[in-house]
Swiss-Prot record:
Biological process, per Gene Ontology: gluconeogenesis; glyceraldehyde-3-phosphate biosynthetic process; glycerol catabolic process; glycolytic process
Binding-site residues for substrate, renumbered to this chain: 6-8, 157, 187
Catalytic activity: D-glyceraldehyde 3-phosphate = dihydroxyacetone phosphate
Keyword set includes Cytoplasm: yes
Pfam families: TIM
EC number, as in UniProt: 5.3.1.1
Record note on quaternary structure: Homodimer.
Family affiliation: Belongs to the triosephosphate isomerase family.
Biological classification of the source: Bacteria, Pseudomonadati, Campylobacterota, Epsilonproteobacteria, Campylobacterales
Function: Involved in the gluconeogenesis. Catalyzes stereospecifically the conversion of dihydroxyacetone phosphate (DHAP) to D-glyceraldehyde-3-phosphate (G3P).
Name of this chain's protein: Triosephosphate isomerase
Annotated organism of origin: Campylobacter jejuni subsp. doylei (strain ATCC BAA-1458 / RM4099 / 269.97)
Keywords noted in UniProt: Cytoplasm, Gluconeogenesis, Glycolysis, Isomerase
Alphabetized Gene3D superfamilies for the sequence: Aldolase class I
Amino acid sequence: MIFAANLKCNHTRASFKIYAEILNKTMGAKCDDIIVFPPSVAFLENENNFMQGAQNFYPCVNGAFTGELGKEHLDEFGIKCVLIGHSERRALGDEELIKVKFNFAKEHGYKIIFCIGENLDTKNSGKTLEFLKKQLEIIDLNYEKLIIAYEPIYSIGTGVSAQTADIAKVLEFLASLTKVPLLYGGSVNENNIKEILSVNHCGGVLIGSAALKVENFIKLIKG
């Protein structure tokens, strides 16, 4: 199972160092199925027992791109995993860059967690599967380092996860399109994680607020 934590705009370099130390000690040995996405200012240079990922990046090595992170910066911290397509990035106008980002990350051999998800209007209109398929049309579903995370927008940060039957329907559909690992994200917590992980084709979870405290993240990993 893959356990990924998106810390979003939380944690400082100092607090994430403590987070990492506790997680490293608890894990004991390296495991690339445990992935943590800290804010870029909190990236750690030292080796960790988990995989450190980037929440965002710009598809360049370096250059005149004010305020952006290029491959050169990710390389300095040994970053080999990137998050692409999160709804909070799409809402900020990232949509047009998604295909370019994916192709750049693929070209340079990054592990990619590619996020897809529909809003409540799309769900209620019965067009979820059609919408998700369209989101996936711009990427290579056969890329060997691809992971797809289904995160319904109406569940992100709301405390209300999607219904298990809905998750199962979507993951079944996605499994018919690709053989890559499939994750669920959207208000994953200690009360629902076991049920979510029991869904057919679910290969793990992408966790947000429930992973902000390392002790909580460890509980979720241990089940």
